[in-house]
Regions:
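C-terminal beta-strand-rich structural cap/linker in extracellular carbohydrate-active enzymes
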Residues: 121-138
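A generic structural signal for short, non-catalytic loop/turn and secondary-structure boundary residues
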Residues: 70, 92, 103-106, 129-130
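Loop/helix patches that line or flank the sugar-binding groove of alpha-linked glycan CAZymes
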Residues: 1-97
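Beta-strand-rich binding/interaction modules
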Residues: 96-115
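Solvent-exposed beta-strand/loop surfaces of large extracellular or lumenal domains
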Residues: 111-125
Length: 138
């Protein structure tokens, strides 16, 4: 674990048996804790969403329904209970991608619950994701 930007990335004061990655000055826990838009804080928000009273039932017991399996560059699925549906959509391609949630045969009223880039483009039931973007809608 790269804890900070000190010698040996703050892991040890001794000699480590594995080399420390040269990026430890830029990528470390201390740096992540200093930025609200860091991966560390994103995972904190993700965990809080999963544990929230409003969504813990659907995230824990909801049926997993794959979505857009024919579309390259997208990994997406819905979690569904009788009363609730959340959509998890990620774009792992190098290009922006637009998907239409009406193809799910539902007409959801969507709200952004979590977005790793904080710039999701949601227009009715159409959503545009930039490269590397992940969003949870509910």
């Amino acid at each position: 674990m790269q804890w900070d930007d000190s010698a040996q990335a703050g892991f040890t004061t001794g000699t480590p048996w594995l080399f420390v990655n040269p990026n430890y000055k830029e990528i470390n826990v201390k740096e992540q804790l200093g930025r609200e838009d860091s991966v560390w804080y994103y995972y904190q928000k993700l965990i809080a969403l999963r544990k929230s009273e409003d969504y813990k039932e659907v995230f824990t017991y909801g049926k997993v329904v794959p979505m857009f399996v024919e579309k390259d560059g997208i990994f997406a699925y819905a979690r569904k209970t009788e009363d609730q549906t959340v959509y998890i959509i990620t774009n792992y391609s190098r290009e922006d991608i637009t998907v239409d949630l009406l193809t799910t045969n539902e007409q959801p009223k969507l709200h952004v619950l979590l977005d790793n880039k904080n710039d999701v483009c949601l227009n009715g039931n159409r959503i545009r994701l930039s490269s590397g973007q992940a969003v949870i809608l509910g």
